[in-house]
């Protein structure tokens, strides 16, 4: 079947997989927010059981264990959906031996996942990494070949699952940061599949020349703002996976200063202040829910270090830069393309997401890092990155003329200039 043929059900299934991935990222964020990542200490088994056969009474309703095990199960489901998309794409876009080999390869990897040993999963992750790299090369040569996008997504989900498991067994924060970052990239790839398989994408006009694209200034703003958001999410993931609690708990200042000192004497004071605040909150019954489970994570037992404060402050500064850049993108897009243009609407949505995201970040600080708000902060961060990425893709590939209002205003300006001359 042609690469350009449209399948409504394939598109719907891809959208469903994107929604499940978004939920999965939220579940992963909750695991980290509640410091629950090591409540199930083994992998790929769970308390010695096959992960899918863990008795319900060992994880349902148990704080921390429920979040971690549910995250593992949801990740497996997303992996299965991604495998389904890969099989579907290869069945549609290839023929004869190529189709058979590709589908057989996916089915073999699914079968090998039944061998629940860490060595097997690591070997599969290495092979999947090579296949992901090969898929990228094929995508560069033919961006419309969705079978290779699907292969990339399936390869990534295998690597992502193994990284999540190794984070448990190797106890390395760096793996956690990589795991969180790759999740965002995987979400973008999967959403690209959903976008490229949509009827709108098939029927909209592809840009033949640079002149038929959105103005360069609009494309650049979408791209660089998205890149900055991606770097911001890496900063955020690094902060979360330090498992150091909240190094600063006031806003807009930080420890009463615009840029807090990180001298040893001041660090000692910050730690003493945080301990006193934690004790006060505990005395006021603000740290635990009625079941005795923690609700805020002001401290995790680790002392505040200079690197924790520096990272926190850089995160604040980058947030301001993102807000300014996305605001500029919205203004420029409206001026260049008109208020009714698709990219103008998308830029307004993007700005709204950034404002909500900034508000959630502030509340995370002022409310002493409650798990629910911190998790929402992760989710809106993913949505913000995804919106920027889709704006970047659309602005650099579709021929979407400016709205009539924008063209008319530009013509009026030209007429006035000619009359004045």
Identify the meaning behind each predicted range.
Residues 91-144:
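Transmembrane alpha-helices
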Residues 10-37, 228-240:
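N-terminal signal-anchor transmembrane alpha helix
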Residues 66-81, 115-127, 174-187, 310-328, ...:
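Membrane-interface loop-to-helix entry segments
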Residues 82-90, 322-337:
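Hydrophobic, aromatic-rich transmembrane alpha-helices
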Residues 92-101, 135-151, 330-350:
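Membrane-interface helix-loop-helix junctions at transmembrane boundaries of multi-pass membrane enzymes
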Residues 31-40, 117-123, 158-181, 239-250, ...:
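Interfacial helix-loop-helix junctions of multi-pass membrane proteins
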Residues 1-9, 95-98, 102-108, 140, ...:
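Membrane-interfacial, low-structure loops and terminal tails that flank and connect transmembrane helices
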Residues 32-69, 245-307:
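Extracytosolic (periplasmic/ER-lumenal) interhelical loops and adjacent juxtamembrane/interface segments
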């Amino acid at each position: 079947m042609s690469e350009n043929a449209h399948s409504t059900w394939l598109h719907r299934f891809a959208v469903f997989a994107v929604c499940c991935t978004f939920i999965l990222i939220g579940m992963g964020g909750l695991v980290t927010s509640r410091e629950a990542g090591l409540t199930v200490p083994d992998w790929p088994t769970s308390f010695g059981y096959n992960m899918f056969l863990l008795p319900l009474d060992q994880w349902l309703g148990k704080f921390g264990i429920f979040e971690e095990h549910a995250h593992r199960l949801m990740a497996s489901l997303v992996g299965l959906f991604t495998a389904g998309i890969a099989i579907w794409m290869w069945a549609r876009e290839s023929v004869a031996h190529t189709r058979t080999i590709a589908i057989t390869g996916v089915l073999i990897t699914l079968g090998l996942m039944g061998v629940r040993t860490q060595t097997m999963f690591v070997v599969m992750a290495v092979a999947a990494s090579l296949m992901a790299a090969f898929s990228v090369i094929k995508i560069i040569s033919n961006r419309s070949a969705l079978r290779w996008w699907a292969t990339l997504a399936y390869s990534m989900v295998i690597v992502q699952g193994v990284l999540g498991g190794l984070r448990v067994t190797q106890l390395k924060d760096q793996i956690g940061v990589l795991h969180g970052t790759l999740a965002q990239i995987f979400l973008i790839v999967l959403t690209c599949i959903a976008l490229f398989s949509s009827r709108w994408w098939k029927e909209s006009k592809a840009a033949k020349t640079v002149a038929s694209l959105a103005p360069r200034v609009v494309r650049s703003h979408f791209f660089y703002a998205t890149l900055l958001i991606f770097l911001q999410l890496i900063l955020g993931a690094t902060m979360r996976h330090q498992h150091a609690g909240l190094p600063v708990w006031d806003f807009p200042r930080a420890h009463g200063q615009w840029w807090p000192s990180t001298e040893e004497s001041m660090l000692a004071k910050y730690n003493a202040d945080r301990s006193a605040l934690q004790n006060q909150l505990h005395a006021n019954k603000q740290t635990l829910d009625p079941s005795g489970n923690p609700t805020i994570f002001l401290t995790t037992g680790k002392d505040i270090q200079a690197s924790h404060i520096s990272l926190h402050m850089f995160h604040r500064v980058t947030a301001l830069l993102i807000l300014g850049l996305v605001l500029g993108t919205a203004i420029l897009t409206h001026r260049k393309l008109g208020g009714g243009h698709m990219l103008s609407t998308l830029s307004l949505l993007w700005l709204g997401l950034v404002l909500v995201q900034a508000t959630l970040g502030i509340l995370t600080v002022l409310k002493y890092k409650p798990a629910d708000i911190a998790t929402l902060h992760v989710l809106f961060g993913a949505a913000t990155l995804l919106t920027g990425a889709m704006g970047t893709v659309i602005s650099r590939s579709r021929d979407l003329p400016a709205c009539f209002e924008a063209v008319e205003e530009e013509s009026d300006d030209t007429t006035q200039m000619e009359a004045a001359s």
